[in-house]
A protein has these predicted regions:
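Transmembrane helix interruption/hinge and helix-loop junction motifs
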Residues: 34-42, 154-156
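The first (N-terminal) embedded transmembrane alpha-helix
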Residues: 18-31, 37, 46
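Central hydrophobic cores of alpha-helical transmembrane segments in multi-pass inner-membrane proteins
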Residues: 46-56
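Juxtamembrane boundary at the C-terminal end of a transmembrane helix
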Residues: 216-229
């Protein structure tokens, strides 16, 4: 076994986790600040991310016209939804904060649950490291976090938790979808723009799906699915 194929040591894994944590913290600051201050800062951040995602997608699909068209929809629709949601002066800020909280909690809880419990794989052909334990753990914790927003804002913890569960499921589906696309093209990461995370597509795949889920819920079930929508 040569050095290139040797499994990562504990020290290397810890170093990688530290790099991921630092990168995540650095990205979270401007993201949360832009949500708080709203347009034009949030709009600019979303557009910048969309441009980076477009560049990554075009590299990934190697200029294939059908995949380029698919990428146009995959990137532009969720980006437009995020800008539209935050543009609501009355409820935009809390809606995006809630979405971020649910998606990020799902990601973290799924990772911790999957690593600590293990068990059957969720989709071994698409993402070999993901487990059913991680999937269920992510949904469970995200549901609790989503419902907890009722403490600070008007609304039922039960309904907020329910919509949080839906968004958590959608976010993990979005993660798997992007993994499937990468596997189709035989790549591990969409780029190396974000140290420890890969590319922007790798970092926002769950958020993209979560935003679409909120839009679908809002217009299929009515504006009162959440107290602020």
């Amino acid at each position: 076994m040569n050095a290139a194929s040797a499994p990562a040591t504990t020290e290397q894994r810890l170093s990688g986790m530290s790099l991921r944590a630092v990168s995540a913290a650095v990205m979270a600051v401007p993201a949360l600040a832009s949500v708080y201050y709203g347009p034009p800062w949030f709009t600019a951040l979303v557009l910048a991310a969309a441009i980076a995602m477009g560049w990554e997608w075009s590299r990934m699909c190697r200029g294939n016209p059908k995949w380029l068209i698919a990428g146009l929809f995959y990137i532009s629709i969720p980006s437009g939804i995020l800008i539209w949601l935050r543009g609501d002066a009355a409820s935009g800020m809390i809606t995006i904060f809630w979405l971020f909280a649910v998606v990020w909690t799902t990601d973290i809880a799924a990772y911790i649950s999957g690593r600590s419990i293990g068990g059957p794989k969720l989709a071994p052909r698409i993402s070999p490291k993901k487990t059913w334990a991680g999937f269920i753990g992510g949904i469970t914790i995200a549901t609790l976090v989503a419902g907890s927003f009722a403490v600070y804002w008007e609304g039922s913890p039960l309904s907020l938790g329910l919509w949080g569960a839906v968004v958590a499921i959608a976010s993990q589906a979005g993660d798997l979808l992007e993994s499937a696309v990468k596997r189709h093209f035989g790549i591990k990461d969409s780029s190396s723009l974000i140290p420890g995370h890969g590319g922007v597509l790798d970092r926002v795949d769950a958020l993209v799906a979560g935003a679409v889920a909120i839009a679908i819920l809002k217009y299929t079930l009515g504006r009162d699915i959440m107290p602020w929508l």
